[in-house]
Amino acid sequence: MERIKELRNLMSQSRTREILTKTTVDHMAIIKKYTSGRQEKNPSLRMKWMMAMKYPITADKRITEMIPERNEQGQTLWSKMSDAGSDRVMVSPLAVTWWNRNGPMTSTVHYPKIYKTYFEKVERLKHGTFGPVHFRNQVKIRRRVDINPGHADLSAKEAQDVIMEVVFPNEVGARILTSESQLTITKEKKEELQDCKISPLMVAYMLERELVRKTRFLPVAGGTSSVYIEVLHLTQGTCWEQMYTPGGEVRNDDVDQSLIIAARNIVRRAAVSADPLASLLEMCHSTQIGGTRMVDILRQNPTEEQAVDICKAAMGLRISSSFSFGGFTFKRTSGSSVKREEEVLTGNLQTLKIRVHEGYEEFTMVGKRATAILRKTTRRLIQLIVSGRDEQSIAEAIIVAMVFSQEDCMIKAVRGDLNFVNRANQRLNPMHQLLRHFQKDAKVLFQNWGIEHIDNVMGMIGVLPDMTPSTEMSMRGVRVSKMGVDEYSSAERVVVSIDRFLRVRDQRGNVLLSPEEVSETQGTEKLTITYSSSMMWEINGPESVLVNTYQWIIRNWETVKIQWSQNPTMLYNKMEFEPFQSLVPKAIRGQYSGFVRTLFQQMRDVLGTFDTTQIIKLLPFAAAPPKQSRMQFSSLTVNVRGSGMRILVRGNSPVFNYNKTTKRLTILGKDAGTLTEDPDEGTSGVESAVLRGFLILGKEDRRYGPALSINELSNLAKGEKANVLIGQGDVVLVMKRKRDSSILTDSQTATKRIRMAIN
């Protein structure tokens, strides 16, 4: 009340009213700025001003029972005055010091677990090495980077469910933990955080850091993996850079790196198979990276790379709307075009059919080592502004832009024929033909492009056909800039479609990606990549193909054996035998196949010549299209270890060695597994024992369906008849007995009956 009276009193004085009503707006704005709202306008000043007071801090009343009134030096720690407007006490900064030194201790066991990301960061910095500082112009471009090392790749929603389940397990609310990673993390964290005294909110914040990828759009020159981004402020300024080697790696960077390598290998391999899309999906579904299924990683990981995006498109996931050409990511920033087929003549008078983009368009081009802005219209480059790390990188960007422009002088610069093919030996499309041609040698292209005088523009410089910089002249429309071009910042994802040749299109039908765009760069993955698909056996070389092929036969011997006798053609066409063909000398593949198939047919016809080891050994050779010839072979050659090695048709060799006593098969000295049945047991024990409870009726009868293996017999109902495959690859018809009492006699009669049925 007193205060209000005082204010009324002030307002009654004419001078006060005059000041408040007539003060100019700029002063008024300042007054407003510092007096309106709860937001502190000058925090540092406020802090200094507050800390100059004796008791700037308020604390809960209970503190007076836990802290002495004075410290050892006799300084007062808290005031007897209570804080105006709350029931807290006023405390001196010295009280905080006293508390830190003498306050109660608590268990620290949970700290490294909760603040895991911080502790790990300290370790990385401790073991990292900082090199010299270099002063030079930094070409930085903004890229979307991962700023949070050491995280899992859960979506925000998935992480939220995990955090709620770990931190507030008893709260109400629907939480569905479905993915493998969610369940594993939840279990792990619940165990780690038993009896944890750290505030739940803090735990939730820290868990979020650990579970979710956080990205920012930051100016970067150099490494973009998260262990470099966390020290960005230490390694690059506007005009300097400091060399740095991280003191440790984090799984999220390793996952990104290994995912790219796996995707590239898979796309390259799928492109050369008969049905690329089906093969790609089969491989993605059967591959694991660091023990996690590749398809799960693809669903969660936002890495944008050509091969990764092709795999995502195949799985029906959304991808970025930018497109790829010549290893650069193009994003249209303005303009539009329509496409029209046009026939053009190269300098060698070869006709090319190209899809011409008609209309004015502007693009940003972002590559690994160079970036550019491109303005073009129908078959004409208007302007190209490039920046890059070095001459080579700048030249690469210029070539791609010139080809993309579809200018006539570029097409006329072609010397010789264009006949580039992809890995599957199919001709590349015309635009990629042109690109490959000029990537090999761009001399004529640059020479024929034409040059022009240039104006002196800050930060821009000309470039001559031999790639030397110049301030007077430049190739027509081309300039080199000191500034980089930012990557496209939006993280929007669009629905795309993919055809069986792995060409990815947006909904308007524009091609965004194709296997030609997948980099040929080879790298060594940081995490173990396990390809279970037979298509990837060859990635580790011929020996791996050999071992894997035989391992596959042994693992699937039960079904292989049935197919061998019933439906050999289907067996020979199995894709698992495809990789093996590359080991067999091309000239003789057909003869080998014909020879082995004839041998197998004799085995089927002549009783008692079924030889498991020999069938396993020779089967892969029968997969090639056979040539009929009278040739006989005592050994077959395979190309491994850089030379031809022999597999003996009868008997063991260093390549294929079967040990009868241990039943183990070794291929090139490597263990390839154990055969579950002994090839040389004849009919004596196994069949008669297994055929107890069955009556052998006679020869195979096709009306009762395909032959079952002995293991499958147990599924028959009493009285049911079936064909069954017995040891030597012979098929007989049996019936399951209706009564169990007569089972004992079966063993004795089985052997006789089998012989009779077969003969």
From Swiss-Prot:
One of its GO terms (cellular component) is virion component. A motif (Nuclear localization signal) lies at residues 736-739. Keywords: Cap snatching, Eukaryotic host gene expression shutoff by virus, Eukaryotic host transcription shutoff by virus, Host gene expression shutoff by virus, Host mitochondrion, Host nucleus, Host-virus interaction, Inhibition of host innate immune response by virus, Inhibition of host MAVS by virus, Inhibition of host RLR pathway by virus, Inhibition of host RNA polymerase II by virus, mRNA capping, mRNA processing, Viral immunoevasion, Viral transcription, Virion. One of its GO terms (biological process) is viral RNA genome replication. GO terms for molecular function: RNA binding; RNA-directed RNA polymerase activity. It comes from the Viruses. It is found in: Virion; Host nucleus; Host mitochondrion. Gene3D superfamilies: Polymerase Basic Protein 2, C-terminal domain (3.30.30.90). Disulfide bonds: none annotated. InterPro entries: Flu_PB2_2nd (IPR049110), Flu_PB2_6th (IPR049114), Flu_PB2_C (IPR049115), Flu_PB2_CAP-bd (IPR048298), Flu_PB2_middle (IPR049111), Flu_PB2_N (IPR049106), INV_PB2 (IPR001591), PB2_helical (IPR049113). The record marks 627 as: Mammalian adaptation. Its main location: virion. HAMAP family: INV_PB2. Belongs to the influenza viruses PB2 family. Influenza RNA polymerase is composed of three subunits: PB1, PB2 and PA. Interacts (via N-terminus) with PB1 (via C-terminus). Interacts with nucleoprotein NP (via N-terminus). Interacts (via N-terminus) with host MAVS (via N-terminus); this interaction inhibits host innate immune response. Plays an essential role in transcription initiation and cap-stealing mechanism, in which cellular capped pre-mRNAs are used to generate primers for viral transcription. Recognizes and binds the 7-methylguanosine-containing cap of the target pre-RNA which is subsequently cleaved after 10-13 nucleotides by the viral protein PA. Plays a role in the initiation of the viral genome replication and modulates the activity of the ribonucleoprotein (RNP) complex. This is Polymerase basic protein 2. It comes from Influenza A virus (strain A/Japan/305/1957 H2N2).
